[in-house]
Amino acid sequence: MHKVPTSGGSAKKAFVSALIAGGCLFGAAPAMAGLCDAAFMHNGGQAQLTGSGALTMGANLAFSEVSKQGGDTCQARVVGDASIGLMGMPANKSKLDYWMSVRSGKATFERREADGRREPVNGKFDLRMLGLFAYGEPISKQGQSFPAQKFQINVDHKAVQADPIVVRTGEKTVGQRQTIQTASGSQSCWPIRYSRTIEATKASFNGLVLPVPAMTSAVTDWFCPALNMVMKQESMQNGVASTVEVTHMQ
């Protein structure tokens, strides 16, 4: 994110929402199943994400230099752009050029520096925050549950000075399977419901230190087994709804 608004509570929430942006839509969870077999994981592959409601989010990603070593081990270059806005505020935009490595279902990202070196990515618009692959074991029935999780996002200090952001998700419970419309047509998908709490932290924008209050949301991930992906995430925070979904992939 190149510029961060600094006007009061909205700025604080915009900053944190930009970092969380769908916590389970592209890998904030430690284990990501099926990433190497995703529909876009090939040379020329593409994925597009769009958000609406309180959080407006867009991401256009292109995949190249893809290599697969079998199992859930692969590498790819990910290039594209992302933008995030909150409550009608102007979108913050970032250009992305990352090298992604997946080993045993866990993805890590490195940024290419001007001199050709690779530097680990810890924040900025971290692709692990986008989470299409958050369920590492098969979902087989209504009532199935997944344990609570805790993960930490380390903010890229080249973008903004901030303490690590701690995110906790409650126990996840699978609801009744339903047919929903996705970018890949009608799909029979499982709704997985849980709470997500972002712990209070603080951030410094251009030398101004702002406390960021804790935020709790009710979240529903729509996991579509035929695609092995979360294709849509719906969340509700203080009565305001947001949706982030995959709108295109090839």
Language-model-derived ranges and their functions:
Residues 1-12:
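N-terminal secretory signal peptides that target proteins for export/translocation
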Residues 12-22:
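Sec-dependent N-terminal signal peptides
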Residues 34-118, 155-250:
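Acidic, serine/threonine-rich low-complexity disordered tracts
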Residues 78-80, 125-127, 146-148, 173:
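Extended beta-sheet lipid-handling architectures
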Residues 120-131, 184:
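Acidic/charged, solvent-exposed loop-and-adjacent secondary-structure segments enriched in E/D, K/R, S/T
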